[in-house]
């Protein structure tokens, strides 16, 4: 028991506040544009069709994959607005029955090192840049982009 206790204490002490979604599991697949009612490119609010339910996790262990009608896909972490962890990767934020697609969470303005966090977010968005452009294009063509 002593060895296990030391291991658990060490593991918890080494926890980093910045979350990496590479180890998360894909919990939901969203078909673009079919499963999306609208996406506001200014506020980043995304409204899903009625039958869509998104599982959220404050630790970022859930992922949502957006499959874009024959034009690729991208995956984001699905988190709740009550999360206190810094995410510098694209996220689907659930906030009281509303959802938002952000480049990270929380907004960089409230973080100590704004520049470093924004640079990391920009790098992660570049990784999905082609799929993100297709996402916006498909939604626009379907009349679902605001």
Can you say where each PLM-predicted feature lies in the sequence?
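C-terminal partner/receptor-binding element of secreted or periplasmic proteins
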Residues: 93-146
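Residue-level hotspots at or immediately adjacent to binding/recognition sites across diverse folds
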Residues: 70
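Intrinsic disorder and flexible/low-complexity segments
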Residues: 21-67, 76-80
